[in-house]
Structure formats: structure tokens, C-alpha cells
Regions:
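Conserved beta-strand residues within beta-sheet cores
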Residues: 11-13, 61, 102
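Conserved Nudix-box catalytic region and its N-terminal flanking loop in Nudix hydrolases
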Residues: 21-72
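Generic structural "secondary-structure junction" signal
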Residues: 35, 42, 81-82, 86-89, ...
């Protein structure tokens, strides 16, 4: 999706974990190993965007990890908050505020089979913490850190 706003866009990144492995994609355009994710569209909330992006990019339905607070009154719907937030520069004049979610496949019986989104990605794979170090091109330290925290936190649940 193209940028929605001129200065800052809101995005989601989803680190899906099963059996102590995290799902990562090799992004064609960026030539980087990344989690699933993308822009939050104007007609959706962050939770909806995380579920949509995960399904579009991997074919997997997931449960987001986190606490859903009680609602506070009529017209209020509580959302699962992201595990982390960051802001990262895309260009000299554009930034993304990233909402970083951890998730696990809804179907926990067996192994969820990820489907490659060929128009966007060169590869998709489940990696252990150790396998992240062997990816080519090398995964950024930040993405590797989030991946390892996700494996540690979700892999034990």
C-alpha cells in the first residue's frame, strides 16, 4: 500500500510464533528479512490491520497476544495493545509509527503452513532463534531482537 499520510503513517508488524519458531518473510522490494506487516488502512483499527496483514501475507489466522482491557462504556470497544511501539524513518520527510504485535496461529494442533505471497516476498520461513543469525541477507539487529523476544515470550505459552 502507498503511504496514506504525508509525514507519518501508522503500521503494524506481527511476529507470529509456533513451536519456538518465528515466521519471517524476505521482502522483495526492500531486500530485507522482516516480520509480517504493513500499513493500517483508514477504515481499520490496529488490531484489524494486524489480523488482515497476517492473513494476506501468510494465509494464517492468528490470535494476537496481549490483554484486552474491559470496556469503559457504550460505544467503546477495547483493543489488544501492541507489545512494543517504535517510530522509524522511511525517508527524509516520512516516518512510520510501528505497532509491534506478537501472535500465534489459531490452530495450535500441528504446524501452521505459511503461504508465500509471491507478489511481495521472495521467501517465507519459520526460524528458531539460532537460525535468525544465518539468514542472507542478514536480518537487522532490531528485527532480530523483536523476533527473539517473541520466541521467548510466546514460545513458552
Amino acid at each position: 500500500m502507498a503511504h496514506i499520510h504525508e509525514k507519518i503513517d501508522f503500521t503494524v508488524a506481527i511476529f507470529v510464533v509456533q513451536q519456538s519458531r518465528v515466521l519471517v518473510i524476505h521482502h522483495k522490494k526492500l531486500n530485507k528479512w522482516l516480520p509480517l506487516g504493513g500499513h493500517i488502512e483508514l477504515d481499520e483499527d490496529p488490531e484489524q490491520a494486524a489480523l488482515r496483514e497476517t492473513k494476506e501475507e501468510s494465509g494464517i489466522d492468528v490470535d494476537l497476544i496481549g490483554e484486552r482491557p474491559p470496556t469503559t462504556g457504550p460505544g467503546t470497544r477495547a483493543l489488544i495493545g501492541p507489545r512494543f511501539l517504535d517510530i522509524h524513518r522511511i525517508s527524509e520527510k516520512h516516518e512510520h509509527i510501528g505497532m509491534i504485535y506478537f501472535a500465534r496461529p489459531k490452530n495450535r494442533a500441528g504446524t501452521a503452513q505459511a503461504t508465500l505471497a509471491q507478489s511481495e516476498h521472495n521467501d517465507i520461513r519459520w526460524c528458531t532463534s539460532q537460525e535468525l543469525d544465518a539468514l542472507v541477507p542478514a536480518m537487522s539487529d532490531a528485527v532480530k531482537w523483536y523476533s527473539r523476544v517473541a520466541i521467548e515470550e510466546v514460545g513458552s505459552r
